[in-house]
UniProtKB/Swiss-Prot annotation:
Keyword field contains Cytoplasm: yes
Taxonomy, superkingdom: Bacteria
Taxonomic source organism: Photorhabdus laumondii subsp. laumondii (strain DSM 15139 / CIP 105565 / TT01)
UniProt site (Appears to be important in orienting the phosphate for catalysis): 16
Residues annotated as binding substrate: 16-17, 31, 67, 75-78, 135
EC number annotated for this UniProt entry: 3.1.3.89
Protein name, entry field: 5'-deoxynucleotidase plu3092
Subunit structure: Homodimer.
Binding-site positions, a divalent metal cation: 31, 66-67, 135
Summary of the function given for this chain in its UniProt record: Catalyzes the strictly specific dephosphorylation of 2'-deoxyribonucleoside 5'-monophosphates.
Class of this enzyme: hydrolase
Catalytic activity: a 2'-deoxyribonucleoside 5'-phosphate + H2O = a 2'-deoxyribonucleoside + phosphate
Organism ancestry: Bacteria, Pseudomonadati, Pseudomonadota, Gammaproteobacteria, Enterobacterales
């Protein structure tokens, strides 16, 4: 018997932004799906608009599992995780142990199919970069939503994320920011105005 998917189903019980007051709580499971949506879009934009040649479906799949190890480690707040290089390195080691532990929960005959997904050392640099971009974009979108709801708790977080996005800049991210991000600051009525009848 394998408890792999029983563990993954508990990602919905791990709240993100645990040290911040949230208008709407976000869990790791829903965050992972949004990162998969955005990473997939970034990959398609890269391929269609900017001469890229990445596998958008694989990137979406990797993004779905990108925080899976948090079902074992929990969600460590970013300011803590990256407080200094030593903590970041040690936390990366803990993540590797958690990835290995998750992989070992699978039946032996399935482990080699899941290893390239769960073990982030088997992801290409380009795949990792796109997923990190999507992860940062989704955190930024969460901040926009909270700020739009009047929650000023996210003022510093959005400033930090704007710097992160600038550091992870790419043409596909610029396109996504220009075309898709503005809608996240609008109400349902405002985004529904453009829906064709």
């Amino acid at each position: 018997m394998s408890h792999f998917f029983a563990h993954l189903s508990r990602l919905k019980l791990i709240n993100r932004w645990p040290l911040m007051r949230n208008v709407r709580t976000e869990n790791v499971s829903e965050h992972s799906l949004q990162v998969a949506f955005v990473a997939h879009a970034l990959a398609i934009i890269k391929n269609r608009k900017f001469g890229g040649n990445v596998n958008a479906e694989r990137i979406a799949l990797l993004a779905m599992y990108h925080d899976a190890s948090e079902v074992i480690t929990g969600d460590l707040p970013t300011p803590v995780k990256y407080h200094n290089p030593h903590i970041a390195r040690e936390y990366k080691k803990i993540e590797k142990i958690a990835q290995k532990k998750l992989l070992e929960m699978l039946p032996t005959e399935l482990q080699e199919d899941f290893r390239p997904i769960l073990d982030d050392s088997q992801h290409t640099t380009e795949e990792t970069f796109i997923i990190k971009q999507a992860d940062s974009l989704c955190a930024y979108l969460k901040c926009l939503e909270e700020l739009s709801a009047g929650n000023h708790e996210f003022n510093l977080a959005i400033a930090r994320l704007e710097k992160t996005l600038a550091d992870r800049h790419s043409q596909e991210m610029d396109y996504f920011m220009k075309v898709f991000v503005p809608g996240f600051s609008l109400s349902l009525d405002e985004i529904s105005l453009d829906i064709p009848h």
